[in-house]
Amino acid sequence: MTVYNAPIQETWFVLRHVVRIGELAHLPGYEALDEDSVKAILDSVGKFAANVLQPLNHSGDAEGCSRSIDGNVTTPAGFKPAYDQWVEAGWPTLEADPEYGGMGLPKVMATAVAEYVLSANQSFETYTGLTSAAVSAKRKAALSRASRSRSRAASCC
């Protein structure tokens, strides 16, 4: 069986010495970030990727998803409990706005997390990646509509 070990020390090195994440706390979007939190997230997600996601890699490839005639979708064996753990840990909300229940962390943290998930189990990452993309698209569409509404209101008075 294949083993996955997340490159936690390497990721930490890049974030600390190349990105200089510790120096970014004064920037918008980085306020909630501190070195202890970064390390804890990398450690937790790395363990989850190695211990939960990587062992499911084969079922994701071999079984895939299936859709019944009545429209119900079945995911590969183990994916539902893994997804439940993923959500329970709060990782889908890393970069989401705290106003809507997110952690408000910068994209660089979500990218590091996605790298671990993708490396451990590409099939599983399609669920989490598509969800993040959908949330981002909805947010941008809502902001665009709000901006157009403000522009129209300002131009009519």
Predicted regions and their residues:
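N-terminal glycine-rich flavin-associated loop
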Residues: 126-146
